[in-house]
């Protein structure tokens, strides 16, 4: 809803500043959309800002590399941090403000309260990264309290995360509408991700195979092929393309994320979600697509 303007994005670094800004907007009759990120922004992130702008009159993005969602040995220290570039990108899509809190601002000394979304956090990525969704739910709950938005937009590329946040909002009664934004892809189908920056040229050339394999599997299952057959073929294709390890390629219920039977075809009219996680070199890529028969 924002019109083109020349004003730069407002930089906000504390909870009090952010709440004062949002309060002033709301008192003036504005509505507020929020897009939390960890920075290293790409077109996928910017599309989430633009989706929020379809619903609200003001948009806020946050950039915070959340230590609570990284386990020892993961890439917290090496995760790309590009504050200046990110702010320029947000300004290019007329984002009104960017929230850049410190760790101390998000987790004041002595904080002991965390948010755990049972069941949804323990499947799929939760098996391989058991710390991850507890860190995500906790930081997003805190960011919601800081930003107090009317609408928040999360990418469907992180589909399990989106479902965890939706459940948390429902269970805790946050008065926030959660919207999923479509996955942005490169020309070869690879889902845009900040971690794609880790890929070597050879790895990048091979990485699109994860989407190609999923797309073929989804098409076959939509025509009645057994999931077990389609998923096995997808795994083989991914490994042959140069991925070194697969964590999972699985078909799940879109809402509960519970695995669907692999030995029976999808029923006519049934909807499912195909999710995958695999390693190429030292980089773990995830992706998902919808499947409908």
Curated annotation (Swiss-Prot):
Which residues does beta-alanine bind? 69
State where the protein is found.
Answer: Cytoplasm
Q: Name one GO cellular component term.
A: cytosol
Source organism superkingdom: Bacteria
What's the top EC group for this one?
Answer: ligase
Q: Which UniProt keywords apply?
A: ATP-binding, Cytoplasm, Ligase, Nucleotide-binding, Pantothenate biosynthesis
Q: Which Gene3D superfamilies does this chain map to? A: HUPs (3.40.50.620), Pantoate-beta-alanine ligase, C-terminal domain (3.30.1300.10)
Q: Which GO terms describe its molecular function?
A: ATP binding; pantoate-beta-alanine ligase activity
Tell me which EC number(s) this protein carries: 6.3.2.1
What Pfam families does UniProt report for this protein, alphabetically? Pantoate_ligase
General remark: The reaction proceeds by a bi uni uni bi ping pong mechanism.
The protein's job, in short, is:
Catalyzes the condensation of pantoate with beta-alanine in an ATP-dependent reaction via a pantoyl-adenylate intermediate.
Q: Which family does it belong to?
A: Belongs to the pantothenate synthetase family.
Which protein is depicted?
Pantothenate synthetase
């Amino acid at each position: 809803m924002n019109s083109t303007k020349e004003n730069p994005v407002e930089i906000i670094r504390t909870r009090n500043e952010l709440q004062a800004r949002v309060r002033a907007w709301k008192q003036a009759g504005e509505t507020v959309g929020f897009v939390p990120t960890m920075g290293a922004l790409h077109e996928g992130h910017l599309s989430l800002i633009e989706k929020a702008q379809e619903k609200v009159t003001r948009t806020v993005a946050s950039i915070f590399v959340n230590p609570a969602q990284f386990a020892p040995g993961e890439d917290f220290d090496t995760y790309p941090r590009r504050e200046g570039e990110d702010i320029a990108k947000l300004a290019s899509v007329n984002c009104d403000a960017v929230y850049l809190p410190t760790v101390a601002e998000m987790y004041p000394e002595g904080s002991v309260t965390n948010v755990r979304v049972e069941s949804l956090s323990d499947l799929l990525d939760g098996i391989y990264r058991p710390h991850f969704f507890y860190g995500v739910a906790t930081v997003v709950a805190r960011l919601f309290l800081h930003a107090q938005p009317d609408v928040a937009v999360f990418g469907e590329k992180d589909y399990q995360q989106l479902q965890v946040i939706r459940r948390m909002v429902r269970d805790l009664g946050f008065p926030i509408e959660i919207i999923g934004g479509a996955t942005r892809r490169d020309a070869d189908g690879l889902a845009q991700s900040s971690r794609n920056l880790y890929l070597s040229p050879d790895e990048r050339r091979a990485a699109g195979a994860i989407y190609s394999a999923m797309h073929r599997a989804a098409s076959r299952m939509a025509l009645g092929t057994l999931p077990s057959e389609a998923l096995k073929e997808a795994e083989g294709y991914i490994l042959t393309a140069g991925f070194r390890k697969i964590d999972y390629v699985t078909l799940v219920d879109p809402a509960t994320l519970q695995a669907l039977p692999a030995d029976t075809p999808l029923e006519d009219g049934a909807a499912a979600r195909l999710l995958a996680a695999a390693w190429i070199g030292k980089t773990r890529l995830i992706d998902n697509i919808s499947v409908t028969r």
